[in-house]
């Protein structure tokens, strides 16, 4: 079953609705530049009300590893998503002693999936999220990964590591993306929104239903 993550949560009602519809993980964006930015205290208030079996993921772009550790501890974040090229394998290894870590890559045409292995060996990270590349932009882009690039990242079989697909996914295209690439998980933010930071409950339900149907034989 393809795992699901809805990112850019800023409101309790959105988080509770997604949880009731069976989402696997919720993302809280701590990047100060994001239109979906949330403070650690606001995230904590939401997380305190959520069911225990929904993973709480923090998205980080500007913060140092020490700041990330502090935010995760305070807000009860269980997974740190390192959404910037600035984070090294050493940074990821430092954080892995405290939380699970997802390292994000934004592959362009020159990206080699073979580069994952040395990063994994040095950092201990086993989960990688792939978002669309857009020059000069960090964090989520809301655009789809080019098909030719995605095919390299998500080979037909035998791929090591947990590989998560992000970038431009919505209720209308997520099922085809799952059938085509068979990722471990799918991640969306803008694809289920009414406007940045405000989720549309009908789109959330439709997205999660599309994922379930795509996994049926």
From Swiss-Prot:
<dbReference type="InterPro" id="IPR011060">
    <property type="entry name" value="RibuloseP-bd_barrel"/>
</dbReference>
<dbReference type="GO" id="GO:0000162">
    <property type="term" value="P:L-tryptophan biosynthetic process"/>
</dbReference>
<dbReference type="InterPro" id="IPR044643">
    <property type="entry name" value="TrpF_fam"/>
</dbReference>
<dbReference type="Pfam" id="PF00697">
    <property type="entry name" value="PRAI"/>
</dbReference>
<keyword id="KW-0028">Amino-acid biosynthesis</keyword>
<comment type="pathway">
    <text>Amino-acid biosynthesis; L-tryptophan biosynthesis; L-tryptophan from chorismate: step 3/5.</text>
</comment>
<comment type="similarity">
    <text>Belongs to the TrpF family.</text>
</comment>
<keyword id="KW-0057">Aromatic amino acid biosynthesis</keyword>
<dbReference type="GO" id="GO:0004640">
    <property type="term" value="F:phosphoribosylanthranilate isomerase activity"/>
</dbReference>
<keyword id="KW-0413">Isomerase</keyword>
<dbReference type="InterPro" id="IPR001240">
    <property type="entry name" value="PRAI_dom"/>
</dbReference>
<keyword id="KW-0822">Tryptophan biosynthesis</keyword>
<dbReference type="InterPro" id="IPR013785">
    <property type="entry name" value="Aldolase_TIM"/>
</dbReference>
<protein>
    <recommendedName>
        <fullName>N-(5'-phosphoribosyl)anthranilate isomerase</fullName>
        <ecNumber>5.3.1.24</ecNumber>
    </recommendedName>
</protein>
